[in-house]
Regions:
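Active-site loop/oxyanion-hole signature of alpha/beta-hydrolase fold enzymes
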Residues: 60-94
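Acidic catalytic loop of the alpha/beta-hydrolase fold
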Residues: 221-225
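Catalytic active-site module of serine/aspartate enzymes centered on a nucleophile-bearing elbow/loop
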Residues: 240-271
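Short beta-strand/loop motif that positions the catalytic acidic residue
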Residues: 210, 216-218
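Conserved alpha/beta-hydrolase catalytic His-Asp/Glu region
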Residues: 151-192
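Conserved HGGG/HGGXW glycine-rich cap/lid loop of the alpha/beta-hydrolase fold
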Residues: 7-65
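Flexible "cap/lid" loop of the alpha/beta hydrolase fold
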Residues: 117-146
């Protein structure tokens, strides 16, 4: 197992493909472990010509706890630590949901390490966009469980509320949720990640100053972070390109993988 050290925090990471190829760093959303980026999905990026890095954010999976009161900048610096450990100078940074916020912060705070930004199903932090439905917000704020059966049911409830309509395989999701629980169950860490996201507030003015090739992707069926969050992100980042994916909710089941990989490959080729 590979770990990168960032002061007192140890970050678990995995790689796919040839390190000589352009590196694509995949950053997870709230509470998600690196295995949420399924291995087959990572291999599709490898086939598209990328060296892929996935890692557990601090406070989840096999990475260590973060100190109280950490920020999105601290979480972005964990990605830098992984790149340092691999001796990689620059990377294309792909983040979903909270991972998109971390990726945006990476581009803002570490521009010399950011080859390009891909912000997926995320938002700027402005309170007037990217808002959840009442049902999604209530479920998001439901505390996690240290009981395996309840943790699995909570995962399935999330899929039913904000997953992509017509693309939810409950049997597969139940199996995956069990694998996630068995790998690491750390609901308290999820709460600290959520606090970091809330403390950051609006990134709009900082995003306006970015000088990095940017692709913003959002599904039109997202009930957790409304598509207005993605639209605003693309509006404020200079020369950003926006891709709306029809039928995609606040997840990326394998039905959408080819579309996502193709979009990222085209984005890279146009830089």
């Amino acid at each position: 197992m590979a770990f990168a050290e960032n002061d007192e925090v140890s970050i678990y990471f995995e790689t796919f493909g040839n390190i000589a190829d352009p590196t694509l760093v995949l950053i997870n959303g709230l509470g998600n472990q690196c295995i949420a980026y399924r291995s087959d999905f990572c291999e599709m990026f490898v086939e598209a010509g990328f060296h892929v890095v996935r890692f557990d954010n601090r406070d989840v999976g096999l990475s260590s706890d973060g100190p109280e009161g950490y920020s999105l900048k601290d979480m972005a610096s964990d990605a830098v630590a992984v790149l340092d450990d691999l001796a990689i100078k620059k990377a294309h940074v792909f983040g979903v949901s909270l991972g998109g916020m971390i990726a945006q912060t990476f581009a803002i705070e570490f521009p010399d390490r950011c080859a390009s930004l891909i912000s997926v199903m995320s938002t700027t932090g402005d309170s007037d966009v990217g808002r959840p439905t009442d049902e999604a917000r209530e479920l998001l704020l439901t505390p996690g469980s240290t009981r395996r059966d309840l943790a699995i049911e909570l995962h399935l409830a999330g899929k039913r509320v904000w997953g992509s309509p017509g693309h939810i395989d409950e049997a597969s999701e139940r199996t995956f949720a069990g694998e996630v629980f068995d790998r690491a169950c750390r609901p308290m860490g999820v709460g600290r990640q959520f606090k970091a996201s809330r403390a950051d507030r609006s990134r709009t003015e900082r995003l306006r100053e970015l000088d990095v090739p940017t692709l913003v992707i959002h599904g039109d069926c997202d009930t957790l972070i409304d598509i207005s969050g993605g639209i605003r992100t693309a509006e404020v980042i200079p020369h950003a390109r926006f891709l709306e994916i029809k039928g995609m909710g606040h997840d990326y089941p394998d039905y959408f993988w080819t579309n996502l990989v193709s979009a990222v490959r085209e984005h890279y080729q146009n830089i």
